[in-house]
From Swiss-Prot:
Its main location: cytoplasm. This is COP9 signalosome complex subunit 3. GO terms for biological process: positive regulation of G2/M transition of mitotic cell cycle; protein deneddylation; red, far-red light phototransduction. Keywords: Cytoplasm, Developmental protein, Nucleus, Phytochrome signaling pathway, Signalosome. GO terms for cellular component: COP9 signalosome; cytoplasm. Pfam families: COP9_hel_rpt, PCI. Component of the CSN complex, probably composed of CSN1, CSN2, CSN3, CSN4, CSN5 (CSN5A or CSN5B), CSN6 (CSN6A or CSN6B), CSN7 and CSN8. In the CSN complex, it probably interacts directly with CSN1, CSN4, CSN6 and CSN8. Interacts with COP10. InterPro entries: COP9_N (IPR055089), CSN3 (IPR050756), PCI_dom (IPR000717), WH_DNA-bd_sf (IPR036390).
Length: 429
């Protein structure tokens, strides 16, 4: 049982009296840390205890009690009861107070995520966790431990737009590498769901090129999707990894992603029949990876790539000619592909329904409209912001004792002294 000093009533009274100034909150935090083991062992602590606290005013104390009440084995009934309580707390709590015990807040939010997944209702957790991210973030540039969890719920709920709302900020501060890997991987999948393939490529690229001593499962899955999205969006596959990719990635990716590399090489050859035959042969592997839908989009994009090539050679073509040249079944299929490409802005063309002729046009965009100027200005401002972030990171590194110590040790290995020739001595051979 809890002693007189740490009785539940005494803790409640302390929470009510010490939830004001920063100094009081610091003292309260020390008290709660000392009392948490006793609170877990106290049978008198139950959800009705929370009625004595205001979640918005006493957020720190409320968090400690809520963590005690939600720990342990979970049944579906317990999960269903706890979800609204946790969600209400997340939505109403004070950001400044919960940041004092951010690890507990993260743990509570992960409990909520597990609860909604267990009940098969991931959408129920999306809103509260989006609020949790905003409250936990000190800066929009910082990646929190909750970013991957939000994106995971959005993927399971197919609420892609909600997930995309936290992908627009440029992240420059990261605590745990695993959070970054998952954030970029799940974020890439969110963008694929929205068909924002350029952004998906950026995020998957971050996973593929991230520093790693040995390849992890997240990076391997990201590379598979990176290949497929490259085919869909860029219409080509590059067999060589970016130079900034780690040695582990350079060495291992090709060994574990053979079917995808084979698919990319076949795509580059431009022979649709061979590509479709390869997809049939490797169908089970693509389906096991849950990438068959993307593979089919890649095959479809080869038709579009071949149609795009025709626009560079011809001014007019019949739909039947297009079907024959790109190996489509009939003129109707060719018309569907051309219309989709016009809608996506990939080509500019007019289809004459009377004679089935397609007239290819020049790009009407003259880059003079107010909308285009706004887009260009936005890109310039983002670039300026990134430049400032890089300068700030460089200055921070230059003052970091650990970094300076490492640089000093490395420099000593190659410091030969002033009396050593700077140019190697030449010998006649």
């Amino acid at each position: 049982m809890i002693g007189a000093v740490n009785s539940v009533e005494a803790v409640i009274t302390s929470i009510q009296g010490l939830s004001g100034s920063p100094e009081d909150l610091s003292a309260l935090h020390d008290l709660l840390r000392g009392a948490q083991d006793s609170l877990r062992a106290e049978p008198g602590v139950n959800f009705s205890t929370l009625d004595q606290l205001d979640a918005s005013k006493h957020s720190l104390g409320y968090l400690y009690f809520l963590e005690v009440l939600t720990c342990g084995p979970v049944s579906k009934e317990k999960a269903a009861y706890e979800i609204p309580i946790i969600a209400r707390f997340i939505n109403s709590c004070d950001a400044g107070q919960i940041r004092l015990a951010s690890y507990k807040f993260v743990s509570l939010c992960k409990i909520l995520k597990d609860h909604v997944i267990a009940l098969g209702d991931p959408l129920r957790g999306v809103g509260p966790l989006l609020n949790a991210v905003q409250k936990l973030q000190v800066s929009s540039k910082r990646l929190t431990a909750l970013h991957p969890d939000v994106l995971q719920l959005c993927l399971q709920a197919k609420s892609y737009k909600s997930g995309f709302s936290i992908l627009s900020d440029d992240i420059v501060e990261i605590d745990q590498p695993r959070d970054f890997f998952l954030y970029s991987y799940y974020g890439g999948m969110i963008c694929i769901g929205l068909k924002r393939f350029q952004k998906a490529l950026e995020l998957l690229y971050n996973v593929v090129t991230a520093p790693m001593h040995q390849v992890n499962a997240i990076a391997l899955e990201a590379y598979k999707k990176y290949i497929l999205v490259s085919l869909i969006h860029n219409g080509q596959f590059t067999n060589t990894l970016p130079k900034c990719a780690s040695t582990a990635a350079q060495r291992s990716f090709k060994n574990y992603t053979g079917p995808y590399i084979e698919l990319g090489n076949c795509y580059n050859d431009g022979k649709i029949g061979e590509l479709e035959a390869l997809v049939v042969a490797r169908n089970a592997e693509f389906e096991e990876d849950k990438n068959l839908g993307l593979v089919k989009q890649a095959v479809s994009s080869l038709y579009k790539r071949n149609i795009l090539r025709l626009t560079q050679k011809y001014l007019t073509l019949s739909l039947q000619d297009i079907a024959n040249m790109v190996q489509l079944g009939n003129a109707k299929e060719a018309e569907m592909h051309v219309l989709q490409m016009i809608q996506d802005g990939q080509i500019h063309a007019l289809i004459n329904q009377k004679d089935g002729m397609v007239r290819f046009l020049e790009d009407p965009e003259q880059y003079k409209s107010s909308e285009m100027i706004e887009i260009m200005d936005s890109v310039i401002q983002r670039t300026i912001g990134l430049s400032k972030n890089l300068l700030a990171m460089d200055e921070s590194l230059s003052c970091d004792p650990l970094y300076l110590g490492k640089v000093g040790r490395e420099r000593q290995r190659y410091d030969f002294g002033d009396d050593f020739d700077t140019v190697p001595q030449k010998f006649s051979m």
